[in-house]
Structures are given as C-alpha cells and as structure tokens.
Amino acid sequence: MEQKIAIALKEIARGTNEIIGLEYIEKLVRKYYETNERFIVKAGFDPTAPDLHLGHTVLIQKLALLQQYGARVKFLIGDFTAMIGDPTGKNETRKPLNREQVLENAKTYEEQIYKILDEKHTEVCFNSTWLDALGAKGMIELCAKFSVARMLERDDFTKRYKENRPISIVEFLYPLLQGYDSVAMDADIELGGNDQKFNLLVGRFLQRAYGLNKEQSVITMPLLEGLDGVQKMSKSLGNYVGITEEPNAMFGKIMSVSDDLMWRYYTLLSTKTLEEIEDLKHGILNQTLHPKAVKEDLASEIVARYYDNDQAIKAKEQFSKVFSANLLPEILSESDFDEGVGILDVLKQIGFCPSTSQARRDIQGGGVKINQEVIKNESYRFVKGNYVIQLGKKRFMKLNIN
C-alpha cells in the first residue's frame, strides 16, 4: 500500500510547477485505495476556445492521470463569465458569448476531451448553474468575504494600481467567481496554469470562509513550449500541434522538435511512467536506443491517442518515407498570409524560427526552400498563390497567400 501511494504521488507531482496541500492529496489517494471512494478534481476551461492543441492538453493529461488514482473529474466550462466578456475591453478574444455559442463550444470540447479522459469518471459542468442562482444578496455576501487589500496582492492588479491604470470592479469579481466555483463544486483539488495560482488560492480561501470542512489542494501546471522550444505553444505563433490535425501532419510536427524538447513532451504529454521515461534516457545514453526511434515512439503514442494505432503506424511509415527519400509529405499543415508578406516574417510566425536573426541565418545557410527551391534572398516577398515552405529536412508547411 505505501509503495503504491508513493508511486501515485510521484506521478501526480510529475511536470507540475507547484503543489499546495500535498498532504491532503495523499489522504485522498489513500482513502481511494482503502475504500474505493473517489474525490473531486476541478479544472476550468475557456468556452471561447474549444479547438484544442497539445498545449491545452497538459492540464487534461494530468486530470486523466488523477483519474487513475481516484479522481472524479469535474470539467468546468466558465459560461457565466464568458457571457459577460472582458470588462477591460482589451482582450478581443474574450468577447461576450450567447448561450447557444457556449453550448456549441461545449459540445466541441466533449468531442475532444474524451479522447483523453475516462468518460465514466468525468462530468462536464457549467458555472452558470450556481452563479445565476447566487443573486444580488449572494453576490454581496461573496464580496464581503474578501478584501481589496488581498485582491491587490495579485501581480497584474498591483502593477496597474501602482501605475494609476484603471481596474474594473468586475475584474475583481472574476477571481471571486472562480473561487466560489470551488465552494459550489465541493472541490478537493483544483488544477490550473501557473498564471492562475492567485485564483486557485482564492478558491481555497473561500472554502474556509463558507465553512467547508476542507481546503482544496492546488496543482499548477506549466505552459507547454511550442515546436520552436522557445515560446509557448500557440496557434497565433504557428508553433502548435492541433489535436484534430491529420495524423501525418501531427506525426511530422512532433518529429521536428529538438531532442531536448522531446523529454519535456514526454513528461507532460506521455502516459509512460517516470520510470519508463528514465529507461528511455538511459537507452540513449548507453547507445542501445537512437533518439529518432524514441521520438517516433512519442509521435506514435500521441497520434494513436487522437486516432488509432493503425493511423499511427501509417503516419510513421509516411514520415520514414519522407525522411529517407527527402520526399514532400502528402498532408501538410497550412497557414494563411496576405500578399506581400516577407519570408523573415513568415518563418517567425509559423514557428520555424524563434527570431529574425535566426531566420536570416537559416536562409543564408541554404536551409530554407520554397516549392523545393533553395531561397537565399532574405528580402523575398510572397505574391498571391500557394506555396510549400521547408526548413531543413523535416519541417514543411503549406502557405496560402491571399
């Protein structure tokens, strides 16, 4: 029993930024092993962006891992706040949504998350269920439990206050509403990104303030680096792997990451145990395994997760054909640009190069091809049409210039 619990805690801690309340997590896991009683793990997701890439799945992978050790996952869609929108007006991606849009996006989430989560032990929730019912009296009672001084401890609020920049009252409500979610859901553990730590701790505080006989444990997860290994994975930066991408494109993108970044992906995305990952590292060190083969295993695992084993095998075969014969892949990821865009900007925006200076070096070194022709002109600009841009032997993307 003790060894099982130790292994569980080690796997739960894997890849995390911080865990607050580890002792409580140990208690929950122990109780599950002894009584088969599950505990509640909560994680909130933005209903405005249901199209997931691997960066989004870091949290979901951790939720799936926790399910193995007794978690009942409550996948929270913050529809109440989404229907308000961004009170500052600065975040254009957080425009107010109507109920129909929220439900449509939630449906898309469900189609994607059950490729990772055990549906039997997952419940999709909407915070409008309890926040709509809170009413004016309940909202005032909620606000009374937290001080402005405590709210100003949040870094971005502190900075704006010192710079005499406006902070909306509604912005103060966001952490309180998220924290109240933990009260309403009776959460034992809450997961979130490292940038959400303040809000997660508000939930812990409010559980005490509302008289719950618990304080939720908090697990914060890091942002996943994109394919360039420099910036966070992002669609806008072009350094992402979408979980609905074609298998060949998904496989090829994962194979394009550096050997160092591969281990980061193994830690945050693979279902292999830490012990199994260490065995792979030792295999490379003692030269019984080749890094390319280990990376192929990772790519195969991820493709199989979102498709199936047959598709993973075919994607591996296709990649091997391209890699060995320097052929063009049959299926490419695509990016759209306006006519007149320069090649340096394109290389940066699609995530092939982290900087303009690196893009220049790659062009000068003959590593950049357009439609299989080496480009040495760093002032090259695209006219209207379709192109295939290539960096090195393994990185390809289709460009649609409009």
From Swiss-Prot:
The keyword Transmembrane belongs to this UniProt entry's keyword annotation: no
PROSITE patterns tied to this protein: AA_TRNA_LIGASE_I, S4
BP GO terms, sorted: tRNA aminoacylation; tyrosyl-tRNA aminoacylation
Group of enzyme by EC: ligase
This protein's record includes keyword Aminoacyl-tRNA synthetase: yes
Short motif 'HIGH' region, span: 47-56
Domain annotation S4 RNA-binding: ranges: 341-401
Subcellular location: Cytoplasm
Catalysed transformations (reactions): tRNA(Tyr) + L-tyrosine + ATP = L-tyrosyl-tRNA(Tyr) + AMP + diphosphate + H(+)
Domain of life of the source: Bacteria
Short motif ('KMSKS' region): ranges: 232-236
SMART domains: S4
Pfam family, one: tRNA-synt_1b
EC number from the UniProt entry: 6.1.1.1
Family: Belongs to the class-I aminoacyl-tRNA synthetase family. TyrS type 2 subfamily.
Role of this protein: Catalyzes the attachment of tyrosine to tRNA(Tyr) in a two-step reaction: tyrosine is first activated by ATP to form Tyr-AMP and then transferred to the acceptor end of tRNA(Tyr).
The protein's name in its UniProt record: Tyrosine--tRNA ligase
Gene designation per UniProt: tyrS
